[in-house]
Amino acid sequence: MQIVRNVPDLRAARAALTDGGRARLALVPTMGALHEGHLSLVRAAREAGHVVAASIFVNPTQFGPNEDFTRYPRDPERDCALLAEAGCALAWLPEVSTMYPPGDATSVEVAGLSVVLEGAVRPGHYRGVATVVVKLLGQVRPDAAYFGEKDWQQVQVIRRVAADLFLPVEIVVGPTLREKDGLAMSSRNRYLDPADRARAPLLHQVLRRVRAALRDGEPAAAALAAGRRALAEGGFIVDYLELVDAGTLAPLTAPDDGARLLAAARLGTTRLLDTVAV
């Protein structure tokens, strides 16, 4: 696996790996601290016939002033070893000064999708996400980009960006991978202390309960309220638990074919996200 840290080397590596554009290239964007969920995206891209590139960049513009940018786990040597083992051909590790050089003045804002749910709790978060993803897509120029289902709102924001800006890239979503107890895999799970780690699977359990209640015909408002209450009783501070349209993220009063439950809640200082299709 090639590891590149500047744009000229990236362009040269891309040209060589794709045989001048004759082979299809996939990008798996990450912030490092890789887990099996990330690696499953690499393997899925390979199985689809792509040469695979992965980026490792902890993007400062998607963190709020009181969030965990400085303590976000960083171990690029470990991450690169895992990527190579999974069959990744190219690792792109840019510096902040490469992604945001002096004079950088452009950002990408997605109206509507960026200001609800996670965007309401973390103002400006999706501006940072959308901007860095557009930069990465412009640098790597992949035919496809792979993202995880767990960050469902992020996927919809990126799909909207790609459609609105006519970006020639296919957005592919890989399923959420879970620990044996149901907790969605996440780089931030390592922040959980033993007591909170034991409580953490409740988030997915509650989503499944709410889904079952909705399928049994319970009114959405009652099912969601019961879910929020169960999380609070289990030690979570709930940011949101909502039933939404999977594409528009508009709130729903009853499930339909495109319905999805999205949740974010905190245990101690750790925020956990999860989602299930209804």
UniProtKB/Swiss-Prot annotation:
Reaction equations catalysed: (R)-pantoate + beta-alanine + ATP = (R)-pantothenate + AMP + diphosphate + H(+)
Name under which the protein is recorded: Pantothenate synthetase
Source organism (scientific name): Acidiphilium cryptum (strain JF-5)
Positions that bind beta-alanine: 62
Biological process (GO), any one: pantothenate biosynthetic process
Family: Belongs to the pantothenate synthetase family.
Gene of this entry: panC
Binding-site positions, (R)-pantoate: 62, 154
Keywords: ATP-binding, Cytoplasm, Ligase, Nucleotide-binding, Pantothenate biosynthesis
Summary of subunit composition and partner proteins: Homodimer.
